[in-house]
C-alpha cells in the first residue's frame, strides 16, 4: 500500500530559468499533462542585451533544417528573422564568398521577436519573475528540478562541470546598410586572438557585430584596443561608417560541459549541460534539445543520459575543431579561406554535403600537425 501510494504521487517539477531549454522543457511537459513551475530571476524571458544568433546545418547535422525539425518532430514553433544565403569569410589577407543556403538568423534577448519570447508565448505554466529562489530551496519543495539558468555557475558550484574555456565576448548593435541574408565571419589573430568575429544582420539597417576570444594563456592587447581594431576592419569591409547604438561586454564566460546530465532528480540543461558549441560559440540547437529531452525523461519517453549522448559527442567534436583553429596562425588561416572559394566553398558547404563536426576536424587536422 505504501509503495502504491508513493508511485501515485504527482511529480512537482520546478524549472530554474526561463531561457531556451527551460521553456522548451515546459512546453513538452505541458503537452503530456504536467504543470511545471518556472522560476526566473529577471523580469521577463530574455531579459538581457539584444543580439543575433544563427542555427546552421554545421551545428545540427544530420538535421539539415532545424526549424522544420523542431516543428514536425516536437511541435515547437520558432520563426527566424531571415535565412542565410551568403557567407563571406575573412582572414588577414584573404576573403571567400560562399553562396549557399546555410541556415537562419534569429534574435535573442529583450526583443518581441526573440526566441525566448516566441517560446514564452507557447507556455501556459506559471512563471515567477524576479525570483530569489535558490536551487537548494527548490530541491526541498519539488520532486524534480530542471537547472536551466543560462550559465554554468550552478553546475560549477555542484562540481558537475568541466570548464574548457573562459572567453571574452564584446559586441554591439550597429546601424548601416546590410544584406539581411549575408553574414560575415573573421578568423584573424590581430582582431580576435585564437578566436573569431562575426557580423549578423538584424535587418537591412541594423546588424550585430561581435568578437570572441579565449582568456587563458594569452598575452594580448586590452579588450578596448581589440574592439577598436575590429570595428575599423568592419567599417572598412562594409565600406561605410557604422553607428553604434548598443553594446555588451562579457568576461569569463564559461564554455564547458557537465560531467553527468542527471544527478538524482536534477537535470542539467542548456548551458548547465554544455550546450554552447566551442567552435563559433553558438548553442541554441543543443540547448532546445536538452530541454526537450529532460521533459521526455520525466514523461517516461526516454532516459536523459541516453538521449543526450549524441549531444555530448557533438560538443567534444566541436571542442576538437576549436582547438585546431586556435593553433592556426594568420598565414594558415589565409590559406584555408582561399581554399573555401573553390571545392570547399562550392561543394563542402552545401547543406546536403556538409560534414559533421567530427569529419570536419579530421579534414583540418593535417594542417596543424
Labelled PLM ranges:
Residues 113-237:
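Predominantly flavin-linked oxidoreductase catalytic cores and closely associated redox partners
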Residues 258-260, 296-342:
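Active-site-proximal substrate-binding core of FAD-dependent oxidoreductases
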Residues 41-91:
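N-terminal FAD cofactor-binding segment of flavoenzymes
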Residues 16-18, 30-52:
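Glycine-rich FAD pyrophosphate-binding loop
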Residues 21, 44, 152:
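Conserved Rossmann-like nucleotide-cofactor binding loop
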Residues 333-369:
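C-terminal auxiliary extensions adjacent to catalytic cores
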Residues 8-21:
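Beta1/beta-strand and adjacent pyrophosphate-binding region of the FAD-binding site
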Residues 220-294:
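FAD/FMN-dependent oxidoreductases across multiple families
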Amino acid at each position: 500500500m505504501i509503495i502504491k501510494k508513493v508511485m501515485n504521487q504527482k511529480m512537482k517539477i520546478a524549472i530554474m530559468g526561463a531561457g531556451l531549454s527551460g521553456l522548451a522543457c515546459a512546453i513538452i511537459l505541458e503537452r503530456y499533462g504536467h504543470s511545471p513551475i518556472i522560476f526566473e530571476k529577471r523580469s521577463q524571458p530574455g531579459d538581457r542585451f539584444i543580439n543575433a544568433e544563427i542555427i546552421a546545418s554545421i551545428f545540427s547535422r544530420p538535421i539539415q533544417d532545424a526549424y522544420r525539425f523542431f516543428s514536425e518532430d516536437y511541435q515547437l514553433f520558432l520563426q527566424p528573422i531571415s535565412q542565410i544565403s551568403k557567407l563571406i569569410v575573412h582572414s588577414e589577407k584573404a576573403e571567400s564568398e560562399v553562396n549557399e543556403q546555410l541556415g537562419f538568423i534569429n534574435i535573442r534577448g529583450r526583443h518581441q521577436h526573440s526566441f525566448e519570447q516566441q517560446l514564452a508565448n507557447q507556455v501556459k505554466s506559471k512563471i515567477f519573475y524576479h525570483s530569489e529562489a535558490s536551487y537548494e530551496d527548490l530541491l526541498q519543495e519539488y520532486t524534480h528540478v530542471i537547472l536551466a539558468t543560462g550559465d554554468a555557475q550552478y553546475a560549477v558550484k555542484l562540481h558537475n562541470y568541466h570548464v574548457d574555456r573562459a572567453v571574452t565576448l564584446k559586441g554591439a548593435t550597429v546601424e548601416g546598410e546590410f544584406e539581411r541574408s549575408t553574414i560575415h565571419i573573421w578568423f584573424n589573430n590581430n582582431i580576435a586572438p585564437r578566436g573569431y568575429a562575426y557580423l549578423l544582420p538584424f535587418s537591412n539597417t541594423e546588424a550585430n557585430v561581435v568578437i570572441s576570444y579565449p582568456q587563458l594563456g594569452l598575452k594580448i592587447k586590452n579588450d578596448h584596443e581589440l574592439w577598436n581594431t575590429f570595428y575599423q576592419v568592419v567599417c572598412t569591409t562594409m565600406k561605410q561608417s557604422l553607428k553604434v547604438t548598443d553594446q555588451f561586454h562579457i568576461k569569463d564566460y564559461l564554455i564547458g560541459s557537465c560531467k553527468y546530465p542527471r544527478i538524482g532528480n536534477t537535470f542539467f540543461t542548456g548551458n548547465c549541460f554544455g550546450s554552447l558549441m566551442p567552435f563559433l560559440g553558438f548553442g541554441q540547437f543543443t540547448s532546445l534539445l536538452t530541454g526537450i529531452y529532460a521533459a521526455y525523461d520525466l514523461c517516461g519517453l526516454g532516459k536523459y543520459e541516453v538521449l543526450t549522448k549524441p549531444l555530448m559527442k557533438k560538443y567534444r567534436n566541436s571542442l576538437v575543431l576549436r582547438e585546431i583553429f586556435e593553433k592556426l596562425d594568420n598565414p594558415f588561416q589565409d590559406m584555408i579561406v582561399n581554399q573555401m572559394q573553390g571545392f570547399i566553398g562550392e561543394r563542402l558547404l552545401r547543406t546536403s554535403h556538409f560534414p559533421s563536426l567530427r569529419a570536419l576536424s579530421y579534414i583540418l587536422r593535417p594542417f596543424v600537425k
